[in-house]
Amino acid sequence: MTKKLTPQEKKNRKPAVRACVFCHQKHLQCSNERPCKNCVKRNIAHGCQDIVRKRVKYLTGESVPGAVSNKQSTPRKKLKTGPVSTSVSPMDSVKSELTTPVESSNHFPPPMSSSVDALPTTQHSAIEIPPNDQPISDILEVPPLFDSSHMISSEAPETNITLTTQNLITPDPLSFHTNTVSNTTTDVLNKLLNDNYETESMLSANNSNGDHLLGMAHTSSGHLSNGQQFQSNYLNEEYMMLGDIILQSKQASPSPSNTSTSENNTNTLSPSSFGYISNINFEDFNQPKRKVVQKLKDSRPFISLGFTADLAPHDNNNNTDYYDDKMTNNITGKTEEGPGNPIINYNTKFTTDYVPPSITNNLYKTASDLYSKELKNFYYPLSYHALTKLLKVIFGGNDLSPEEKQEKRSKLLIILKLIASYRPTFIAAHRDLIQEDLLMLEMTLQRSLLDYKKLAELNSSPTIMWRRTGEIISITEDMALLLEHSSFDLLKERRFIFELMDDNSIVDYFNLFANIAVGNLKSVIQTAIQMKTKSSNLIKFTCVFTIKRDIFDIPMIVIGQFLPIV
């Protein structure tokens, strides 16, 4: 056995620069002198020599000129003939010749296969491999833009390779978007050039010299190169997300004023735009894009901050009419039936019809009623439109002096700016939710409302509950009596909490709500406001607002408890 070393010996011992063969095989600590101590101790000093290290691949190669001269001086091997002989596919030889200049950028090309040199000079003399027996790697690695009929002969290695328009196959303008996962990293940049690229590719049909087509081929071949992909999977996923947002997203708000014609444009080129181009089916140009979008949605989580292709309006010139018609006519559509989920009723209608709180409060009195009875989603855009109209009425008026009008207008602008600071976040969070998701959010709100109404019955303080838009959904009888209103009158139609506040209290409320709407998860706010009675009298309250949030941390219900100051 090997002698056990003392701690001092272990501390003083230093590793050798290079071990001998024996110490390397036996995993022993070798010394720098030759013969080493271990070999002398075992009487094998005559065979003590340094181990020959295996050289790494990039040190074994030669420079590019040396490699070419080596190939010219190396005699070619004769092709052995036998009862069953196979030859290298013409595409393999083309691939090896084409990849040599590209890989030479890494300073050392891979060793050339001798079977390429043994290829006959004529293509007809090669024994063809049946399509069923052809290796899959040969099919997958075929250069997409090179014509196999113009094969480079191995008998003339010094011949320069020239790529002309006759050697290049005309690429499909949209065929580069088929590989979704590997090519999304470059789609972000290619989107900026995609529209011009498609147009110029069709204009080049009448270009006889073919120079523009050659430039497009070189540009598009870079799109298929793996060199543009990142080595980090996380970085690739980041670019996939950016590709989703930039390539497929439409306008960020359903408001007609924010509609972007260029984003909604599907780039469908009509023959009238290119009257001199014939025999081109312009309807097929957008088909690969739609397949890519569907493939993105099916393969991984899809991110979109706007309308997708199936939800966007088809006529960009009539977007205003589209949204107005959608809000006024209450477009409804039934959801598809699911696989019999006992919790969510998939037969429930997805509708924009308004259901007043007086009906829902009487309809859903227990938790089981939410699952046994029909539930309708709440359409928040209509609520925000109604809120905007109400604010214009509150802060407007023709019987005011110019100073009062200016003061009210400044308050209205402050409120609208505060709403604009957090509403886009609400829209982005709920943009890609399907109909069942919206029904689930409404079910969550109604379920929470049941608990809070029971809590309000046990609490002595007057309470009002409203949605994040300010729309009242519940009020206790004592609070309604303080404000000289009937609870049924406040719940039978769309009424807002701001109708019961004075102007300064409305501005203060929106300042407080904007601070906790996004980012700040504070759930309790204490403040003092003034409420208006039905007879226009003002009552000062000290109040506590409790914020109930949904699964996106967006305010869902605001529970206001009011204590009048006498």
Swiss-Prot record:
Gene Ontology molecular function terms on file: DNA-binding transcription factor activity; DNA-binding transcription factor activity, RNA polymerase II-specific; RNA polymerase II transcription regulatory region sequence-specific DNA binding; zinc ion binding
Compositional bias (Polar residues): 83-93
CDD domains per UniProt: GAL4 (cd00067)
Location relative to the cell: Nucleus
One GO process term, biological-process aspect: cellular response to starvation
This protein's UniProt keywords: DNA-binding, Metal-binding, Nucleus, Transcription, Transcription regulation, Zinc
Biased composition (Low complexity): 253-270
Region of interest called Disordered, as start-end residue ranges on this chain: 65-93, 250-270
Gene Ontology annotations for the cellular component aspect, listed alphabetically: nucleus
Pfam families assigned to the protein according to its UniProt record, in alphabetical order: PAS_13, Zn_clus
Superkingdom of origin: Eukaryota
Positions of the DNA-binding region: 20-48
Family: Belongs to the ERT1/acuK family.
PANTHER family per UniProt: GLUCOSE STARVATION MODULATOR PROTEIN 1 (PTHR47659:SF8), ZN(II)2CYS6 TRANSCRIPTION FACTOR (EUROFUNG)-RELATED (PTHR47659)
Function: Transcription factor which regulates nonfermentable carbon utilization.
Name this protein carries in UniProt: Glucose starvation modulator protein 1
Gene behind the chain: ZCF23
